[in-house]
C-alpha cells in the first residue's frame, strides 16, 4: 500500500470518530470449557456435533488457533510433537506444543481427514483458494451454530463460537499468572497492544469483583 499526503485526502473536512479498539468480552471460565469435554448431548448430525466440540477444545488447547488455520492444518504441520503453522491473518510462524488431549483429537480423524488433520477441506475437492474459502466459511457457520446450541444447553451465558476458545485460552493463562509477552507469542499477535486489548476486559472483571469488597 502506498502513502498519500494529507492534502490528497478527500474527506479531510469530515470528523470521523476514533475506532474503538476494545474487543467484546468473549472468554469463558475454565470450568465452562471443561463442560464441552464432558457433554455428549445429541444435536442434529452427530458427526458435526462431535467435530464442533473437538475443534473448540483443540483451539483452546493449542494456543487459541483460529478456525481457518485449523482447517488448513496437515500432517506436515506436526514437527516433533509440536504444531508449526503460519497464521494466515498475520503471516507469523507459530510453534506450540500439542497436549496429549489435542493429539487424541487429531488421531480421531486420521481416517477421514482427506489430506488435512480435520475433515473440513478435501484436497481432491477444494483446490482453488476460493473453493477453500467458501468451504471454510460454510463449515465455520455450521460449527458455530452447533456451539451456540451446546452452550445454551450447558447453561453457559456467553454466546459460544469458535473464537471464544481463543479468548478463553488467553484469559485462563492470564489468570494463571502467565506473562503477557508469552500469551502474545502463543496467540501470534503482531504486537503486545493487540494482546492487551484481549486481556483488558478480563482485568475489568477482576476489578469489579474486588470492588465488591470495598465496604
Can you name each region flagged by the protein language model?
Residues 27, 87-91, 123, 187-212:
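Catalytic-site neighborhood detector that most strongly recognizes the C-terminal catalytic loop/helix
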Residues 13, 62, 72-108, 123:
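Conserved tyrosine-mediated DNA breakage-rejoining catalytic core shared by Y-recombinases
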Residues 76-82, 157-158, 178-197:
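Short, polar N-cap/turn motifs at the start of nucleic acid-interacting alpha helices
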Amino acid at each position: 500500500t502506498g502513502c498519500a499526503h494529507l492534502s490528497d485526502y478527500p474527506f479531510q473536512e469530515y470528523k470521523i470518530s476514533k475506532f474503538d479498539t476494545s474487543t467484546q468480552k468473549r472468554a469463558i471460565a475454565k470450568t465452562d470449557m471443561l463442560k464441552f469435554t464432558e457433554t455428549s448431548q445429541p444435536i442434529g448430525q452427530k458427526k458435526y456435533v462431535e467435530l464442533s466440540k473437538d475443534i473448540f477444545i483443540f483451539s483452546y488447547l493449542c494456543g487459541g488457533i483460529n478456525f481457518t488455520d485449523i482447517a488448513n492444518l496437515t500432517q506436515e504441520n506436526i514437527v516433533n510433537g509440536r504444531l508449526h503453522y503460519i497464521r494466515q491473518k498475520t503471516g507469523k510462524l507459530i510453534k506450540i506444543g500439542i497436549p496429549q488431549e489435542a493429539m487424541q483429537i487429531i488421531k480421531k480423524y486420521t481416517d477421514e481427514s482427506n489430506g488435512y488433520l480435520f475433515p473440513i477441506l478435501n484436497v481432491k475437492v477444494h483446490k482453488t483458494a476460493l473453493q477453500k474459502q467458501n468451504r471454510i466459511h460454510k463449515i465455520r457457520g455450521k460449527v458455530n451454530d452447533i456451539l451456540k446450541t451446546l452452550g445454551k444447553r450447558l447453561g453457559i451465558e456467553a454466546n459460544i463460537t469458535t473464537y471464544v476458545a481463543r479468548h478463553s485460552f488467553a484469559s485462563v493463562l492470564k489468570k494463571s499468572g502467565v506473562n503477557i509477552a508469552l500469551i502474545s507469542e502463543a496467540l501470534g499477535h503482531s504486537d503486545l497492544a493487540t494482546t492487551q486489548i484481549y486481556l483488558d476486559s478480563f482485568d475489568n472483571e477482576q476489578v469489579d469483583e474486588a470492588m465488591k469488597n470495598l465496604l
